[in-house]
């Protein structure tokens, strides 16, 4: 299926990666791969059959919400324009577009009701 704006990545935000990682790896048979995320600490990749399928990160000052939760990313072609459009449509930019090395550009916006969604303009590996 070649769909426009698909959900392309899921990420767990938790202050206890060890407990959450153990839980989900045992529940679903996922493997864990930890990588250094610099100032953000450890980023953990959930893997199945050697493929990255989701991520896990520590909360940051820019991370919307409280407690542990999952969030999803929707692919967009032009993240800067999409963030501007979100504001024009009555939403808010919660985390401005910024680069993530080897991933692309990401941001978080909310709709007028407060529902949060994360956007990603993936790096072009072609």
Predicted features by range, described:
Residues 1-15, 33-36, 45, 62-85, 105-110, ...:
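Vicinal oxygen chelate
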Residues 2-51, 88:
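Core segments of cupin and vicinal oxygen chelate
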Residues 15, 20, 40, 54, ...:
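Residues in flexible loops and secondary-structure boundaries
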Residues 22, 69-72, 99:
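Residue-level preference for alpha-helix termini and adjacent loops
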Residues 30-67, 112, 116-122:
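Conserved short beta-strand elements that form part of the metal-binding/catalytic scaffold
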Residues 49, 72, 90-93:
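Preference for short coil/turn "hinge" residues that link or interrupt alpha-helices
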């Amino acid at each position: 299926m070649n769909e426009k704006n698909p959900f392309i990545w899921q990420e767990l935000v938790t202050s206890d990666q060890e407990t959450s990682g153990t839980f989900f790896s045992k529940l679903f048979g996922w493997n864990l791969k930890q990588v250094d995320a610099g100032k953000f600490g450890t980023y953990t990749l959930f893997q199945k059959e050697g493929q990255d399928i989701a991520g896990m990160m520590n909360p940051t000052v820019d991370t919307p919400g409280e407690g542990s939760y999952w969030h999803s990313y929707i692919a967009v072609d032009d993240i800067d324009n999409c963030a501007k459009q979100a504001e024009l449509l009555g939403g808010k930019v919660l985390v401005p577009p910024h680069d993530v090395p080897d991933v692309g550009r990401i941001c978080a916006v909310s709709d007028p009701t407060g529902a949060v969604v994360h956007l990603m303009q993936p790096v072009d590996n072609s």
